[in-house]
Amino acid sequence: MAAGRVFAFRDARWAPDPVLAPSAAVRSPQPVPLVIDNGSFQTRAGWAAADPSVPAEPLLRFRSLAARSRGARGGAGAETQVGNDLGSPEPLRWLLRSPFDRNVPVQLELQELLFDHVFQRLGVASQGCVDHPIVLTEAVCNPLYSRQMMSELLFECYQVPKVSYGVDSLYSFYHNRRQNWPCSGLVISSGYQCTHILPVLEGRLDAKNCKRINLGGCQAAVYLQRLLQLKYPGHFAAITLSRMEEILHEHSYIAEDYTEELQKWRSPEYYENNVHKMQLPFSNKLLGSTLTSEEKQERRQQQLRRLQELNARRREEKLQLDQERLDRLLYVQELLEDGQMDQFHKALVELNMDSAEELQSYINKLSLAIEQTKQKILQAEVNIEVDIVDSKPETPDLDPLSSEQSLEDVESINEFEPLFAEEQPEAEKPVAAVQPVFNLAEYHQLFLGTERIRAPEIIFQPSLIGEDQTGIAETMQYVLERYSKEQQALLVQNVFLTGGNAMYPGLKARVQKELLEMRPFQSSFQVHLASSPTLDAWYGARDWAVEHMTREEGWITRKDYEEKGGEYLKEHCASNVYVPIRLPKQAPRTTEALAPSRALAAGTGNPCEQA
């Protein structure tokens, strides 16, 4: 197998975002809009200004995550980290929190932490408020309650002058427009949590016919993690979600024909040429693998000294306990000699003994054991350190007590450290012995074969993970069938792919193949890929903000918020469709309906007053 097919995990740590100093063009002649792509995977923020001195790139890019440590008891020392300040997500995985449920923000206290991070790192200098207009992305067909809470947060907490909401994939479509705007097309947006099929007619979203698939990059990462953990149970803990996301981003691809691609992987030659080996981190210095004979000898002697000290400590503790028990038994024997029979018999019962003979026998045995323990302690103090490497000493040890102690130490060492059980040092082993070669690095490698296509395939075949949903191809066909033939032909001339999953190699070819199968014979269609699938949403929002900076179209002012409610939305070319809440009106109560109730009230008055 080619060595170039071995890839090491980068395990890159996130660098904390610096506090940026905005240029003067951001505030003069008036505050420019602040564009925030509020994605469930990543938050991107930057300025929208026509001045060339202001970067036309998102200045902040961080994961939409926050972690709050508990600190000491009472909350003292608690710390909150947001985005790139986390460093690495794996050690804090159990503490990570996201404001999103799927792709809809529902935890507004966590959303406030993300906004605080954005405003603080971008250097917003206004006191007590954010005096910049905000352009914010939201989910397709965002629930009114979610928009109401978001508007309340922006207007009440940050005192923003105005805000505009738009859909990220429609902003990307707006940024990549290839015809004179407004234009029509079919937008396929596949992100971290969801995949959407969005028909756009004459520059406006047709919300009645848009469809959502509850699968995205998050589910693909979890599926890939389960596949590899089942394949390599020995590396269960090393197969983390962060590494699975790295595999998806850099080593996965979409098969143009999934079944045919699986057949290719059955060929050993194809497998050898296309498998990717992911190298897990490991340590070469294993026990006994790289130690020299001198290091092994020194290690043995250190362990021997520690075990001798441990045995000596145990003997001293045993001697102390035996001595205390012997003193108690001698005290009971003195009661017998003094004639205190009642106390003597009571003490025998407490000691679980039956007679004075049994007491005397136990005293003799305990005295002998104490004497032997004292001799062992004295012998250990004067004994020379035993060389356990030399298994055949020149002169035999004639002292049985010393021999017993040495054997006890050696057995303890062999149980404690497998290194001590070796027969001979390396220098004394026969030269002809051939040691088997074991590639430790290969043992810590993950071989990616069909897994490279199985994980991304779930957006086309959700049944792979047990989801009862249709994939992109079936959903796209279902949406197209809801239009007339003329409108279908118009939509398929501009099929637009965007979102993080559009980065998979082969996605465009797969969509073209699916369209070729479902469209009439010899009909034409065109599939376009976003120039930057992950960043075009921010670029499109910036384009819209620069073009509509001085207009009223699409901007919700504070007056609109106070008069029409937090769920109010001003529509524009990249926004959702606003569907206001229509509460049923109560019918007014007529005088005819009130007459019977008045008569009933008069008839059931106070009986005392009637009398």
UniProtKB/Swiss-Prot annotation:
Keywords: Coiled coil, DNA damage, DNA recombination, DNA repair, Nucleus, Transcription, Transcription regulation. It holds the Pfam family Actin. Disulfide bonds: none annotated. SUPFAM superfamilies: Actin-like ATPase domain. SMART domains: ACTIN. The keyword Lipid biosynthesis does not apply. Its main location: nucleus. It is found in: Nucleus. GO terms for biological process: DNA recombination; DNA repair; regulation of DNA-templated transcription. One of its GO terms (cellular component) is Ino80 complex. Residues 290-329, 355-386 form a coiled coil. Component of the chromatin remodeling INO80 complex. Proposed core component of the chromatin remodeling INO80 complex which is involved in transcriptional regulation, DNA replication and probably DNA repair. Belongs to the actin family. ARP5 subfamily. This is Actin-related protein 5. It comes from Gallus gallus (Chicken). The gene is ACTR5.
